[in-house]
């Protein structure tokens, strides 16, 4: 990300860090112009910048993590695919006359192994977001996803899904086309697939839109991603009739990776580089790639029957609690 882009998309809590880094760059440029050695001073400031970065990103509130998950420069599904796949060939269409650009998928090679990868795709700017419907998939998108997963099952390829959506498309047309049925069908059929399934929340995991490609043997979540039954804004509007109370809603909804790991909903948190994925996208992709390869190796050691049984048990246990 360029300096101008970073300034444009700067979040409030990132400003102290950005100002310090800008000062470091300014000192470095002045030193080069005047042929002055300030390496010791710069090293000291860089250590302070790293300390500040750790301090900021280790104490984020749920609403701040939501801002990171929605960051315009956060890596998308296609960004991760292009970074981690040795080969990639996109497949199109639901075989029912529709090809939803909000949900992409295809065949790839990951760590030398053939896999099928699919996920929701947001846009980079307003025009692209409109074309991608802001990552909100239609019924045709979920049917395309199921077609690709059935194909992966036929050819014994592990399935990787990337979840990044505020929710499934909720328009009248989507309801006419069977949005609820399409998501429910995917939920049922993903429990029946023989191959390993790894689902990863890479950004925003919203409601049924996330669930439609979210049934797997392992549910991973990037450190600063969020996973939620409803957006905090919607929750605040419903409960308190005031969207300004979304920070309180974000806290109550338990949307962060650490909360969801503690609750047993996700299986593993994938760490992000210092400063979050949008600041170092390639490093974030490498961390995710290794986790995916290791998880596929682990799941491949199980039989299809074992995977299906454990997958079913995993989701049956979600929400179980004991009262003293």
UniProtKB/Swiss-Prot annotation:
EC number: 2.1.3.15
Catalytic activity: N(6)-carboxybiotinyl-L-lysyl-[protein] + acetyl-CoA = N(6)-biotinyl-L-lysyl-[protein] + malonyl-CoA
Pfam families in alphabetical order: ACCA (PF03255)
Keyword NAD carried by entry: no
GO CC annotation terms, alphabetical: acetyl-CoA carboxylase complex
Assigned keywords, A-Z: ATP-binding, Cytoplasm, Fatty acid biosynthesis, Fatty acid metabolism, Lipid biosynthesis, Lipid metabolism, Nucleotide-binding, Transferase
Pathway annotation: Lipid metabolism; malonyl-CoA biosynthesis; malonyl-CoA from acetyl-CoA: step 1/1
A single MF term (Gene Ontology): ATP binding
Residue intervals of the CoA carboxyltransferase C-terminal domain: 44-298
GO-annotated biological processes: fatty acid biosynthetic process; malonyl-CoA biosynthetic process
Subcellular location: Cytoplasm
PANTHER family: ACETYL-COENZYME A CARBOXYLASE CARBOXYL TRANSFERASE SUBUNIT ALPHA (PTHR42853), ACETYL-COENZYME A CARBOXYLASE CARBOXYL TRANSFERASE SUBUNIT ALPHA, CHLOROPLASTIC (PTHR42853:SF3)
Subunit structure: Acetyl-CoA carboxylase is a heterohexamer composed of biotin carboxyl carrier protein (AccB), biotin carboxylase (AccC) and two subunits each of ACCase subunit alpha (AccA) and ACCase subunit beta (AccD).
Function: Component of the acetyl coenzyme A carboxylase (ACC) complex. First, biotin carboxylase catalyzes the carboxylation of biotin on its carrier protein (BCCP) and then the CO(2) group is transferred by the carboxyltransferase to acetyl-CoA to form malonyl-CoA.
Family the UniProt entry places it in: Belongs to the AccA family.
Name used for this protein in its record: Acetyl-coenzyme A carboxylase carboxyl transferase subunit alpha
